[in-house]
Amino acid sequence: MSFNRRSKNITEGVARAPNRSMYYALGYQQDDFSKPMIGVANGHSTITPCNSGLQKLADAAVIGIKEAGGNPQIFGTPTISDGMAMGTEGMKYSLVSREVIADCVETCVGGQWMDGVIVIGGCDKNMPGGMMGMLRANVPALYVYGGTILPGKYKGQDLNIVSVFEAVGQFSAGKMAEEDFCEIERRAIPGSGSCGGMYTANTMSSSFEALGMSLPYSSTMANVEEEIVASVKVAAGVLVEAVKADLKPRDIVTKKAIENAVAVIMATGGSTNAVLHFLAIAHAAEVEWTIDDFERVRRRTPVLCDLKPSGKYLAIDLHHAGGIPAVMKELLKHGLLHGDCMTITGKTVAENLADVPDLRADQDVIRAVTNPIYAEGHLAILKGNLSPEGCVAKITGLKSPVMTGPARVFEDEQSALAAIMANKIVAGDVMVLRYLGPKGGPGMPEMLAPTGALIGQGLGESVGLITDGRFSGGTWGMVVGHVAPEAYAGGNIALVQEGDSITIDAHQLLLQLNVSDDELARRRAAWTAPAPRYTRGVLAKFAFNASSASAGAVLDKFGG
């Protein structure tokens, strides 16, 4: 039996002789045309250390596909370095790249009639972009994460990229010597791999393992370790078997599977970006999933892992403590996962976890459900007159996730950062960064530079920051993002004035502008939308087409 269900459309029959000629030029032989064509979406790039170690994984995938009886076909996907673009206009292209990557995967798989695809990525938007493309194409598919980075070292302390952002605030406040500042800058990132805490890249990779679209244990491996190369060869064989079984992404990515992924995001203390990305992933999978579903899962799922940014450990420590399977096994034992969900291995979640040992007593990275770090998840969905469609608050690491204070209003990140660095922001203030949403930014840039500076100055818990933009996975503190409707669309965040009283209350799930309805009506009557910041090119296209953050900021949600 042949398994070239799709590729035979361009390799079989007299009329396809010209097509086969192109394949012969690539070194194919006649008997290759009966084998499945397997795409390898290679995100290798020397733009960023997150992706600079991916070529060896693509090479391993090629070998594994050939050994399993498939024809590997490599094509490229782009990346943006969030860490390098952060705090600049370049950050506006980050979320755009998610859509570009999704389009690349869907286009190549569809245009070349591929029978299956492996997507290999590293930096933050590589994961959701690749998954969205896989789900749109809906051919047998598997995600390979490029691996986490190992920590840097300085004066006996582990370092990572967020260490540098927070050092900026400490140095500017006179709390750090210049020599220490420069050495942290030089030593924080020792080599290839994605940023090391439970930031966005590691959050998404871990969630894909829980979703069933990556192999067990693969999401927390280090890029520089040999085990990841061996894992990719195994993954290639698993994918070829999935092609034979015609096991497709939409057979795996169901509503219950997304609930599993979100439960693991909550248990590991993952990134706020996961909310936006899983809204987009569910849309690509044609699964009914709303921002309120995150809150439903949050309330029943404890935080079990002591991971940065608000905790102690890095992703590689989680790997050594048992990885995502250990977390999932603990959740499954207490009825917090759906064990009957299918995975890319051809086995259910419960079957994959059957031989995973219970939590080891010699580690404190992962806690038991009966002894959690927090009884409920950390990504709370707030609503109120400032965000009737919902917004996302990250409430781990805070003594009290409640405050009321005067608004300090900024319409770009740079002026907000300048105010922090000039010591113009004081405890009790609520910073409002607006016109930074999907349409207004455009591209919903991340606000790690301001939040990192606040933490470095010791203001992380005493200053609130709300925005219609996003936050890096490395952010923690009194922060609320994804405010929807956004300012550019006329959301009430556009009506906030300097000095207005704002309440952030994660206990009551409330984000409220303490201004009367009559006053808001007067302000709205005087408000007009600003002119678009871009009228040509990819940012203009994104701004014109992007849905609300509460719907994932996707570009193909037509008619609403």
UniProtKB/Swiss-Prot annotation:
GO BP field: isoleucine biosynthetic process; L-valine biosynthetic process
Catalytic activities: (2R)-2,3-dihydroxy-3-methylbutanoate = 3-methyl-2-oxobutanoate + H2O; (2R,3R)-2,3-dihydroxy-3-methylpentanoate = (S)-3-methyl-2-oxopentanoate + H2O
Top-level class of the enzyme under EC nomenclature: lyase
Binding site residues for Mg(2+): 82, 124-125, 446
Pfam families attached to this UniProt entry: ILV_EDD_C (PF24877), ILVD_EDD_N (PF00920)
UniProt entry keywords in alphabetical sequence: 2Fe-2S, Amino-acid biosynthesis, Branched-chain amino acid biosynthesis, Iron, Iron-sulfur, Lyase, Magnesium, Metal-binding
EC number per UniProt: 4.2.1.9
Residues in the signal sequence: none
Metal-binding listed as a keyword: yes
GO molecular function annotations of the record: 2 iron, 2 sulfur cluster binding; dihydroxy-acid dehydratase activity; magnesium ion binding
Recorded metabolic or biological pathway in which this protein acts: Amino-acid biosynthesis; L-isoleucine biosynthesis; L-isoleucine from 2-oxobutanoate: step 3/4; Amino-acid biosynthesis; L-valine biosynthesis; L-valine from pyruvate: step 3/4
Disulphide bond pairs: none
Cofactor(s) for this UniProt protein: [2Fe-2S] cluster; Mg(2+)
Binding-site residues, [2Fe-2S] cluster: 50, 123, 195
Cofactor: how and how many bound: Binds 1 [2Fe-2S] cluster per subunit. This cluster acts as a Lewis acid cofactor.
Subunit structure: Homodimer.
Record family assignment: Belongs to the IlvD/Edd family.
Job description of the protein: Functions in the biosynthesis of branched-chain amino acids. Catalyzes the dehydration of (2R,3R)-2,3-dihydroxy-3-methylpentanoate (2,3-dihydroxy-3-methylvalerate) into 2-oxo-3-methylpentanoate (2-oxo-3-methylvalerate) and of (2R)-2,3-dihydroxy-3-methylbutanoate (2,3-dihydroxyisovalerate) into 2-oxo-3-methylbutanoate (2-oxoisovalerate), the penultimate precursor to L-isoleucine and L-valine, respectively.
UniProt protein name: Dihydroxy-acid dehydratase
Species for this entry: Leptothrix cholodnii (strain ATCC 51168 / LMG 8142 / SP-6) (Leptothrix discophora (strain SP-6))
Gene: ilvD
